[in-house]
Amino acid sequence: STRTIAMSIVTALGSFGYFLSPIFTNYSLKEYGWNYTLFIFSLVLITGLVAAYFVRSPSESESVEKTTDQSFKEALTEAFKTKSYILLVSGFFVCGFHITLVGTHVPKYVIDRGLEDWTAAAILSLIGLFNIFGSLLSGYLSAKMSKKIILSAIYFLRGISIILFIFTPASNISAFLFGASFGFLWLSTVPATSGIVAHLFGTKYLGMLYGIVFLSH
């Protein structure tokens, strides 16, 4: 449960950057052009790389999880023979499809429906902002309830959110409501999904097995 909550906190903090970047990008591109904007984003990326270098891996004595004697190949073989793991990989493909669809096409979609470009930027910012709360709640609930139920509910509500947005008359209010609702569900799948992988196979190869799930994203 602690691991699931920790994953939700990391996801939530990552969403804070997603909240800020559309606002900054929209302003910077208009005022200073793409060269300056790209330079600033490069500096931010370098900062992240430097921070990652100092991340400390836990020693064996600090680990509270029991690990198996499985080899890398054995763990991979077991995973792909497990129906639940295949379903997770497939589900995360749908998750990535949702996110890419919204991130790529919604900004142009709202402009085509007569709204301004700042509205598109606001939608993406709201997605990042509300994903902070969605990820934290998902992590908390995943530690208390069935993770597969949490995951199923998130995917179902995402579909409802997209359908309502498409068939609702275009306005800033409907756009902002969509950004908030979809943002709440944006990456709230991560804590539940990583928790299920850890529950199925333990933590020894969690990074690799969850990485494969995320690859399908």
Language model segments and positions:
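A late C-terminal transmembrane helix in Major Facilitator Superfamily
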Residues: 18, 187, 200-217
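Extracytoplasmic gate region of multi-pass secondary transporters
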Residues: 80-140
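Intracellular juxtamembrane helix-capping segments at the cytosolic ends
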Residues: 1, 7, 188-201
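Flexible cytoplasmic inter-helical loops of multi-pass small-molecule transporters
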Residues: 56-74
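Helix-loop-helix hairpin linking two adjacent transmembrane segments in secondary transporters
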Residues: 9-60
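Juxtamembrane helix-start elements in MFS-like secondary transporters
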Residues: 7, 115-124, 171, 175, ...
